[in-house]
């Protein structure tokens, strides 16, 4: 069934209103109209079955039939801090990790990042990245749209990275695996942050700075993973470990 994320202010009592791009997509792409049923989400985890009742020149109205009782969000909140790679790679990272269950994305510029963004370019990129995340969330059955933070420097990111379990996969770590780190956790962390380096990896200085802030370095295995693969592997392993992708 077709799914739409809308703002909570577009839900009034039992009436739902679709506007703009959602209206266009519903009518002109999906060819749906009065009598058809869709799924609407308010971005706060609430999901509704809605029947379309009326179409006007600028809005589509629907009636809430029932609130859906379904849990599609991981119990662990997972933040992916991704050193910015080239545009197409980052778009893939956003799409696939949204499908998987990541809750928040923090793009970051590191010493070996080969991406330069001025203010106007970043604004355009953020708009496109938001769109990719939203579409991936709709397609994959998410009940929230993951948060996308603005691009930050390494130092800015570390300053706000002081809660929960912080992990930094690093090719220089040969002793401690992700499994070993997780087995030492006394309880399920409410928040896990994973720091992923660029194509050339983190500098030693960055790893030291992260560990000084409490990050735990670890290895993801004997093979070196691409930047777009590393985050997906780490997120998959974490969500599986905590029971989101199957029984432990």
Tell what function each PLM region has.
Residues 204-248:
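Structured adenosyl-cofactor binding patch, chiefly the S-adenosyl-L-methionine
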Residues 9-15, 55-59, 69-72, 119-120, ...:
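Short, glycine- and charge-enriched coil/turn segments that flank and shape catalytic ligand pockets
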Residues 2, 12-14, 34-36, 46-48, ...:
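A generic structural signal for short beta-strands and their flanking turns/coil linkers
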Residues 35, 97, 133, 210, ...:
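Residue-level signal for inorganic ion chemistry
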Residues 164-201, 205-206, 215-219:
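Active-site/ligand-binding-proximal alpha/beta "capping" segment
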Residues 16-18, 75-79, 190-193, 212-220:
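Glycine/charged-rich beta-loop-alpha catalytic/anionic-binding loops adjacent to active sites
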Residues 65, 71-167:
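RNA substrate-binding interface of SAM-dependent RNA methyltransferases
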Residues 1-69, 120:
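N-terminal positively charged helical leader segments and presequences
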């Amino acid at each position: 069934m077709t799914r739409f994320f809308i703002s909570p202010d577009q839900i009034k009592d039992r009436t739902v209103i679709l506007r703009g791009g959602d209206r266009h997509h519903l009518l002109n792409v999906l060819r749906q109209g009065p009598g058809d049923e869709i799924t609407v989400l308010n971005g706060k985890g609430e999901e509704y079955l809605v029947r379309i009742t009326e179409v006007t020149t600028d809005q589509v109205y629907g009636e809430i039939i029932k609130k859906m009782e379904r849990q599609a969000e991981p119990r662990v909140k997972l933040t992916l801090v991704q050193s910015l790679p080239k545009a197409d790679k980052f778009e893939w990272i956003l799409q696939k990790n949204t499908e998987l269950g990541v809750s928040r994305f923090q793009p970051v510029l590191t010493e070996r990042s080969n991406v330069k963004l001025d203010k106007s370019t970043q604004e355009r990129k953020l708009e496109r990245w938001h769109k990719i995340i939203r579409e991936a969330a709709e397609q994959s059955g998410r009940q929230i749209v993951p948060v996308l933070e603005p691009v930050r420097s390494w130092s800015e990111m570390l300053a706000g990275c002081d809660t929960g379990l912080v992990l930094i996969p690093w090719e220089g770590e040969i002793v401690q695996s992700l499994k070993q780190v997780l087995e030492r956790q006394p309880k399920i962390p409410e928040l896990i942050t994973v720091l992923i380096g660029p194509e050339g990896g983190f500098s030693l200085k960055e790893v030291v700075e992260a560990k000084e802030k409490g990050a735990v370095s670890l290895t993801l295995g004997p093979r070196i993973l691409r930047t777009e693969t590393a985050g997906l592997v780490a997120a998959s392993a974490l969500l599986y470990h905590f029971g989101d992708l199957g029984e432990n």
